[in-house]
């Protein structure tokens, strides 16, 4: 309104951010809540700057020699030197998609403004050193794969252990309808949000189908399949099997059939090889849960249940 007319640019920017940021975050939390996801902590990058955490990290890197001041006043980080331990290649992609020799990277520009990389380092230092987490698990888009070694190397440079940072690289999701990709473009505003998707697809179907593939595999999300209520839809297939099992257990209970312990079971009654195969497979389920956790791959659970 009129209150903003005579403000200078910096004041106007602060006022807009102060008004818009809480609303945007509330919207994200609302949408994620519909998908049954709750984040315990929402961390603001701006806090790293306002608290002096970014400057402290850069100063520390200067003290150790991992950074130096260039002739134009920019602060450069010896990225290739520290990333080499983690197998970084000697080339990197530029903004236009071409490749160039890997070289030292800017942490603070000549005009004094820190880069995103400086804030990234400060965040991980905050998590692992200041807040004392034993492990940091990042989820990035697969197009950032070239940054993994650089980030791990930066952890070493700052006095932490790069091995304490695990990065899960996620591939893209393609929405399909009638066997064809649904065309989307951020530039034209033609995009489908998670909220849009959940207005069309049941939440159980969305969660199950998204979790059918490991992070490294691209996902073709079939919108037609997701709304089916037959065995073509894996989530319906699994829910039907679960309902049948519950029905059998309920019938046993109503008829007074006791659940015997393993030592009381007469295994000689199991004459069909498929019965033993099923028992062996069920016995492997606890270990499958452990593997899913250790490998950051919950899709193993979905695939196990379908099998």
Question: What positions do the PLM features span?
Answer:
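Non-catalytic interaction-recognition regions
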Residues: 1-307
């Amino acid at each position: 309104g009129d209150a903003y007319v005579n403000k200078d640019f910096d004041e106007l920017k602060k006022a807009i951010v102060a008004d818009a940021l809480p609303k945007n975050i509330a919207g994200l939390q609302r949408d994620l809540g519909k998908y049954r996801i709750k984040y315990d902590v929402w961390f603001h990058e701006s806090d790293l700057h306002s608290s002096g955490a970014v400057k402290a990290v850069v100063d520390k890197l200067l003290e150790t020699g991992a950074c130096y001041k260039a002739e134009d006043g920019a602060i450069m980080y010896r990225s290739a030197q520290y990333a080499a331990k983690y197998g970084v290649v000697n080339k990197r992609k530029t903004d236009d998609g071409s490749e160039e020799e890997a070289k030292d990277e800017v942490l603070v520009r000549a005009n004094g403004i820190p880069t995103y990389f400086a804030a990234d380092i400060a965040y991980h230092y905050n998590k692992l050193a200041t807040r004392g987490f034993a492990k940091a698990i990042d989820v990035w888009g697969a197009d950032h794969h070239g940054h993994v070694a650089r980030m791990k190397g930066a952890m070493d440079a700052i006095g932490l252990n790069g091995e304490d940072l695990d990065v899960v690289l996620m591939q893209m999701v393609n929405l399909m309808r009638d066997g064809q990709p649904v065309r989307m473009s951020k530039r034209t505003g033609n995009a489908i949000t998670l909220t849009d998707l959940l207005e069309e697809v049941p939440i159980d179907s969305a969660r199950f189908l998204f979790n059918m593939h490991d992070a490294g595999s691209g996902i073709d999300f079939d919108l037609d399949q997701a709304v089916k209520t037959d065995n073509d839809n894996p989530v319906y297939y699994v829910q039907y099997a679960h309902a049948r099992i519950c029905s059998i257990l309920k019938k046993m209970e109503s008829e007074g059939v006791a659940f015997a312990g393993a030592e009381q079971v007469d295994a000689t009654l199991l004459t069909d090889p498929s019965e033993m195969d099923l028992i062996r497979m069920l016995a492997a389920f606890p270990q499958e849960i452990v593997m899913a956790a250790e490998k950051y791959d919950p899709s193993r659970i979905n695939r196990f249940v379908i099998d």
